[in-house]
């Protein structure tokens, strides 16, 4: 008589997605949502399961094209750094910068598993002095869409023309620094890629007027 072991062996061997693959799929979805909110074109047909190509053994890249050139550095390249299980050092940063230069990219997002070493952070700051913008995220920050949290109000980045109209309406003599501020280190500011001097419109539900609107300058 066949025992339990022979019965179980007759079951089809179906490969299950690894935890790493599922994690990377979530990151890929969040990246697409984030870049969409920033005004970049995103392939709507991209299957999240394709995130498996972002294997941390190699530096892999995806480039996003902006829908509008206003307020952007042109295409944004997203790199998944290769130092699996460790902080990313200067070497991978230099390799990424070389690839950016060869591809004529001036804006990049680097996704690291556990962060960057202090020298790598310094290297990023130095390259940004040359007019290149580099943003860094750890994977844990991209496991969810911060804008989908029920307590996060709607944020809309004003165009330069809208900003000028606002400053005139508030009679601020063109000085946006007189507005309340939001720091570039704020999670929503980082998610939206806000930079110094930009103005963001924040809409919150209000019990009296239905919707409360405030404006903040990025500091």
Please report, for each region that a protein language model flagged, where it lies by residue.
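Short beta-strand/loop turn elements enriched in aromatics
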Residues: 148-177
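Short, structured beta-strand/loop micro-motifs enriched in basic residues and often containing a Trp
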Residues: 174-186
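Short, charged beta-turn/beta-strand-edge "cap" motif at the junction between a beta-strand
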Residues: 204-210
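Helix-rich terminal scaffold detector
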Residues: 1-106, 118-130, 134-135, 140-145, ...
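Short, compositionally biased
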Residues: 210-219
């Amino acid at each position: 008589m066949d025992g339990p072991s022979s019965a179980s062996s007759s079951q089809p061997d179906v490969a299950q997605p690894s935890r790493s693959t599922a994690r990377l799929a979530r990151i890929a979805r969040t990246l697409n949502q984030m870049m969409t909110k920033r005004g970049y074109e995103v392939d709507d047909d991209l299957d999240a399961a394709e995130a498996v190509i972002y294997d941390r053994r190699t530096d892999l890249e995806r480039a996003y094209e902006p829908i509008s050139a206003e307020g952007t550095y042109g295409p944004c390249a997203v790199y998944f750094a290769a130092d699996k299980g460790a902080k990313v050092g200067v070497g991978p940063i230099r390799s990424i910068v070389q690839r950016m230069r060869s591809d004529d990219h001036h804006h990049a997002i680097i996704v690291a598993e556990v962060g960057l070493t202090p020298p790598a952070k310094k290297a990023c700051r130095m390259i940004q002095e040359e007019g290149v913008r580099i943003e860094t995220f750890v994977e844990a920050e991209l496991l969810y869409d911060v804008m989908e949290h029920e307590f996060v109000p709607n944020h809309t980045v004003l165009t330069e023309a809208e900003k000028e109209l606002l400053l005139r309406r508030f009679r601020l003599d063109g000085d946006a620094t007189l507005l309340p501020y939001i720091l570039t280190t704020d999670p929503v500011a980082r998610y939206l890629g806000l930079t110094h001097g930009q103005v963001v419109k924040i809409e919150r539900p209000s019990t009296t007027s239905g919707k409360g609107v405030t404006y903040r300058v990025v500091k």
